[in-house]
A protein has these predicted regions:
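Membrane-embedded helical hairpins/re-entrant loop segments and their flanking transmembrane helices
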Residues: 64-91, 252-270
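Transmembrane helix-loop-helix hairpins in multi-pass inner-membrane proteins
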Residues: 1-41, 92-203, 283, 287-340
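Membrane-interface helix starts
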Residues: 13-16, 45-54, 222-236
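A short amphipathic helical element positioned immediately N-terminal to and/or at the very start
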Residues: 38-45, 112, 213-226
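Alpha-helical transmembrane segments of multi-pass membrane proteins
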Residues: 83-92, 128, 265-276, 305-314
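Membrane-interface interhelical connector segments
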Residues: 192-225
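Hydrophobic alpha-helical transmembrane segments
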Residues: 51-55, 82, 86, 123, ...
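Transmembrane helical segments that form the transport core of multi-pass membrane transport proteins
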Residues: 221-274, 281
Length: 340
């Protein structure tokens, strides 16, 4: 695994991905069409300063992803600078959308390879980055749910029906990946299953590649997880990242005059459940599951037009603006790589 070819998608693939994004956006607009006048009116209440503040909070998400990436990669490359960690986060954000949900790790692995980290360890470290993110999502939602369960059960019992599925998916991913990383018996089982793949052509190449990735994943996980202070710092960064992300709906309620008496921590709970439940729903390039979960959670507390307005505010700041910034970040990161 020593490819240094750029992961930049072809023009055709880029246009296809952007077309899918535009189609999904069009579907959302079509669904909201009966309330579009109210949504537009609510968004028009935002001042320039409020809009810029919301964008800044939304952009904190990929920037903190970059800090986490920096902390993780420094376990193998001690002189890896913070700016390159942020560049790596832009790679992941841009790749996730352009790759329709499957491009994050390949883009980041390629970037780290160009910065001196072999592909195998790069895949291992970025997989562990994903584990830390999922763990933070699980912990954040669980702590707030334990504190606020009586309140949400009294006001929105429908959401609670989806929590077992969300816990099964998120906890299953975490336990499965940690077991694959740390338990020799699971690693042996995975190797045994891989040997059932066809022994010819591209399947043979894939099997060898996956076996190599499995070995490096085991090595990198043992190395990183043994550094307890570093792991605590990484998890802490992810928790701060989620806290700031979940501030956006509270800001939207205040800025657009949609306040319904929800406290700051109640909004934090509702938004954490939105992200948590979305993990149990299918999505394309990060769209679909969040929108569905958001309306499911907030519909018990806001009228339809208000919940849709808040959703548009939230996604404009946390998804569309972030993707646009990642396109710029991706281009600048490639330029810096080409300059050496």
């Amino acid at each position: 695994m020593r490819s240094s070819a750029s992961p930049a998608p072809s023009r055709r693939k880029t246009l296809l991905s952007l077309g899918v994004l535009a189609l999904l956006t069009g579907i959302v607009v079509f669904i909201f069409r009966e309330h579009w006048a109210e949504i537009s009116e609510a968004l028009s209440r935002l001042t320039l300063g409020q809009g810029l503040l919301a964008l800044a909070v939304g952009l904190s998400y990929p920037l903190l992803e970059g800090v986490s990436s920096w902390l993780i990669v420094r376990s193998r490359l001690p002189h890896f600078p913070l700016r390159q960690g942020i560049d790596n986060a832009w790679m992941g954000t841009f790749g996730n959308v352009v790759g329709l949900g499957a491009g994050s790790v390949p883009f980041q692995t390629w970037y780290l390879h160009r910065r001196g980290l072999d592909v195998g360890p790069g895949v291992g470290l970025m997989t562990l980055q994903y584990v830390f993110h999922k763990t933070a999502v699980l912990l954040y939602a669980t702590v707030l749910l334990l504190a606020g369960r009586p309140w949400i059960a009294a006001h929105s019992d429908g959401v609670l029906r989806y929590l077992p599925g969300a816990y099964a998916v998120v906890a299953g991913v975490i336990v499965g990946l940690i077991a694959l990383c740390a338990l020799p018996v699971v690693q042996r089982l995975a190797r045994w299953l891989l040997h059932f793949l066809p022994d010819t052509g591209r399947w043979a190449e894939r099997r060898e590649s996956w076996l190599e990735q499995l070995d490096t994943l085991s090595t990198e996980s043992r190395h990183l997880l043994a550094d307890k202070p570093r792991c605590a710092a990484i998890l802490g960064v992810h928790l701060v990242k989620l806290f700031l992300l979940f501030c956006l709906p509270w800001m939207g309620l205040r800025f657009m005059g949609l306040d319904t008496g929800l406290t700051f921590w109640q909004v934090q709970l509702l938004t954490s459940l939105t992200l948590f439940v979305s993990n149990a729903l299918p999505n394309v390039a990060g769209m679909g599951s969040v929108e569905t979960a958001f309306l499911l959670v907030y519909s018990s507390f806001l009228p339809d037009a208000s919940s849709m307005s808040l959703l548009m505010f939230y996604r404009l700041a946390s998804y569309y603006a972030v993707f646009a910034a990642s396109a710029v970040g991706f281009a600048l990161a490639q330029r810096r790589l080409n300059r050496g």
